[in-house]
Amino acid sequence: MTAPVRFPRFFVTSPAPCPYLPGRSERKVFTELKGANADELNDALGRIGFRRSQTVAYRPSCIDCQACVSVRVVTGEFRPSSTQKRIHKRNRDLEVSICKAWSTPEQFELLQRYLAVRHPGGGMAAMDEMDFADMVEHTPVKSYVIEYREPTVDGSQGRLVGACLTDEQGDGLSMIYSFYDPQHETRSGLGTFIILDHIQRAARAGLPYVYLGYWVEGSERMQYKVRFRPMEKLGRDGWERFEPAEQASAIERAVTARKCEPASLVEGSLKDGVHGAQERYAHI
């Protein structure tokens, strides 16, 4: 006898200050990922704009705002810009390894340095090593950590300069959280390189998309995501391709925003997250 299908229960968080747009509040809807069908549910929810944080899938559900837009890169048609080509060339000697979703002290130390520069005073800045382990290891779906290390002459394990917690979905790779050395002496653009590597990796695996999370028009520090072309965004009628002129205009605004921001705070300085979302919620 076939077991009955269990539909997920969804909850909504209480309003909280928006981390992207000053003066606004945010609210999220979320559900728990668990059991034998967690991967299947995560795939289905990912296609309608949900993101994963540990055992929770969530998406914005703000009352008076729809600024957070889910975006994904079309891997088979991706064409890097001249700047992206230079960044890739500068960092292509890095040793890239796919590791099990298991935290290490070396990863945590790199995360702390990253947060100290990119998110000083942010919600994640107070994370301890146990919190980091929970973030990486508490996953009910197919996940891994991709590490980026400098090469060594003798073939020994080199210095860790970047890492990304990544989910493998049925139609692509979902970049859950990436971090890197924000003050490396010679390697600028590490955040961009990690995205480029994911695009190449997905294309080689026959996966059509790389999910980058939410692009927030009006949030200067989120504009870096729109620089990868071609890109699709999730709207009321489903996924649709950015019009070339529309994306070119968004990229121009991103370049302008970059010139106005301190260098240490531009690339990837705000991340999608549902930190503490389970603390205050109502069933819907």
UniProtKB/Swiss-Prot annotation:
Catalysis: reaction(s): N-terminal L-glutamyl-[protein] + L-leucyl-tRNA(Leu) = N-terminal L-leucyl-L-glutamyl-[protein] + tRNA(Leu) + H(+); N-terminal L-aspartyl-[protein] + L-leucyl-tRNA(Leu) = N-terminal L-leucyl-L-aspartyl-[protein] + tRNA(Leu) + H(+)
GO terms of molecular function: arginyl-tRNA--protein transferase activity; leucyl-tRNA--protein transferase activity
InterPro entries the record matches: Acyl_CoA_acyltransferase, Asp_Glu_LeuTrfase, N-end_Aminoacyl_Trfase, N-end_Aminoacyl_Trfase_C, N-end_Aminoacyl_Trfase_N
SUPFAM superfamilies: Acyl-CoA N-acyltransferases (Nat) (SSF55729)
One GO biological process term: ubiquitin-dependent protein catabolic process via the N-end rule pathway
Cellular component annotations (GO), alphabetically ordered: cytoplasm
Keywords: Acyltransferase, Cytoplasm, Transferase
Protein name: Aspartate/glutamate leucyltransferase
Organism field: Novosphingobium aromaticivorans (strain ATCC 700278 / DSM 12444 / CCUG 56034 / CIP 105152 / NBRC 16084 / F199)
